[in-house]
């Protein structure tokens, strides 16, 4: 995930040729209803991916408004609240924008993107794009673990290798410090494989639970697992120590790069 404002993004954009792609969308007022044929976009921009298997790589981010959770440490609450400012854009418009950016990695985030009824349509369009190098786009959906992934997993299985692009899921398991663990859907995690990622954002006291859940869901060796610190609540070194103490050779400790590079920027990075 990633965040920031249009002016901040313009200053942080990796290349001037991407400047047009980094513009924040025009906003509709909170009381203007979203068209059924469009999706509510809080922001879209190009930056580096801050976490996961594509960390450090340029990516086109599309952030949708709305979320079904209220995590205590949420850093994108501005996009989650009812009536959050957004621009209504059709899937075809978003696919055209991604094409314009000239980047290979695409991250669909939020909010909670899986709540968007038109997300499967957008994903199918993106998977059909040839991408800048003719190898297709690497499409990633960042999701909170509490929205059913069944339809999207079925789409991935149906499309298979017929489309040039690839689809992966980065799925959170919310730990006790989030206040949302009871909302997790274990069935989602049975749909995941080697191309996907399970992410645990850890606060003080969460690490033993993360290990317990990883084992219960049979994640080690089946799905890549990332452990990230809840900034300001736990030192990253403690995560490394816990991994050492428990021989967690199958897990990866990771800090969010965008928060290291732009610690005071909230949107567009």
Regions found by a protein language model. Give the residues of each.
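Short alpha-helix boundary/capping segments
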Residues: 11-21
